[in-house]
Amino acid sequence: MGFAFLSNLLMRPLMNYRHVAGDAGNEVIPDLAARMPEISQDGLTYEFTLRRGVRFGPPLDREVTSRDVAYALERVATPSLGARYGFYFMSAIEGMSDYASGQASSISGIETPDDDTIVFHLLQPTGDFLKRLAMPAAAPIPEEVGGCFTEPGYGRYLVATGPYMIKGSDSIGTECDDLEPAAGFAPNRRLTLVRNPNFDFSTDDPTIRSARFQRYELTVESDISKIYRRAEAGTIDIAPGGPGLDVIRRYTSRASLRNNLHVESGDRLWYISMNLTQPPFDDVHVRRAANFVMDKDFLVRTWGGSLQGSVATHVLPDDMLDGALEGFDPYRSRHHAGDVRRAAQEMRLSRYDRNDDGLCDADACRDVVHVARSSPPWSEMTGIIESSLRKIGIELDTRPNDDAYSVIQKVPNDIPITSAPGWVKDYPDPFSFIGFLFDGRNIRKPANTNYAMVGLTEELAEDLRIPAPDPPVPSIDAGIDRCAATLPSRERTKCWAELDKSLMTKVVPWIPYLAANKLVITSDAISPYEFDQFSGEISFAHIGIDRSL
């Protein structure tokens, strides 16, 4: 949701998207940039000219310069501020890692020869670099306000460049000692956006944002049933979260509600992750057996069946590969219900099957810690996962947690298996799936997303102060680098497709089970309706409201 508000309404990065559904919504186009960049023949230099007349909103009133873009990326490279997004840029821009580590006082690969020009020098050709620059993290930030924050917290003081701003932004102030957070943003409670008076529509591309509303009000509500009761009553206009089975049944069975349920391709995947450093999942044959035996059909039905998506059989959403892996299923079973016979055959090859009976019968196969979410549908999946793995001798010790991510993202916790994760692309390219989730160089002690620990080396383990993997775990870092350097083409698609196949057959870090749709519920008054393929949310940039409906 944050990506949607930032890219649709609040911020103007160099590049952006049209915020519509389908392939057209995945095409990157200039926003703050006046035109597409000049790219050197070797693909290592990108030169952008900024659009004139784009101004920061209150409390500032000045034109955006190239230095504001460079400063935003300096923040991305600052470990205390960059969240997870630094990886996308430090792996691409020359000198960014040196800046992040404190070895350099500036980023050598970013030049701002004048206020209207910014030049990037890359470490290697990067086929999706324009899409990385379209992420909100790369949108301009004014140093006079952003520089007041050496730790996270700037979000409540965000200075807008888009058509909307946070209510109360005009009262933030510009002196670090006197800053007051914008009244319209109360984290985890509410967000109110109003028109940015400094936004000039003549500087904008109307295909990016229509900006039809005068005001947006977002309320955070933990009672899911209350959200959908209010949506049905028409007292709220958008319910973008995941509706439960009872809500889905009402909206699909009642003619008066049917048109208000929108089913979109969400470019997202739900999966079970196995930690390659923890027994018994440190044996690839156990991981393959777990894939063979899992009843994916039952798992998908707990989510609500085909309306929620289709059974996933590999890592990347099919739309990202132009269908190159449609039909690829290395662990095929009848109706996706699991194949105990083939699972047992695979288990017999494992060192954890000591009796050669197709069962995991070593001590490591008992009381295997499984971290799950405590709310539906994950809580309803637990019995299916336990029952499936019990067929190959693995007994789980399931530990439900309201905040499962806080547990599994801490590397020292050594969680062997978790059914909590899902992933939605950060931008429409396979690098934002495979590159981000499986690059060993992106394993971090806090906020780790490579739960399987693919690519963990002895050196990295030492840096993280965790035991070195024994036996060593496989790495796909070289394959990621090869695919990332390939320019957009059939060859790039083929490269990622082959790497996906290798992940699922040789590395086997996941049991993917649901290639998920995005379900959005709206009131009758939302007209026109549009979906934003980039953010995977309703298109706040283009929807309108008609109270006569």
Spell out what each predicted region is.
Residues 18-20, 104-106, 125-215, 225-226, ...:
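Gly/Pro-rich hinge or "lid" segments in bacterial periplasmic/extracellular proteins
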Residues 35-88, 119, 230, 280-283, ...:
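Aromatic- and charge-enriched surface segment that lines or borders ligand/interaction sites
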Residues 167-173, 180-194, 204, 217-278, ...:
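Extracellular/periplasmic solute-recognition and catalytic clefts
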Residues 47-49, 64-68, 75-148, 152-157, ...:
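Surface-exposed binding/hinge segments that line
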Residues 288, 300-303, 309, 334-341, ...:
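Extracytoplasmic/peripheral linker and loop segments enriched in polar/acidic and small residues
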Residues 520-549:
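Long beta-strand-rich cores associated with HINT superfamily self-processing modules
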Residues 307-355, 372-380:
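Structural transition elements
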Residues 1-41, 159-161, 165:
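N-terminal lobe/hinge region of extracytoplasmic solute-binding protein
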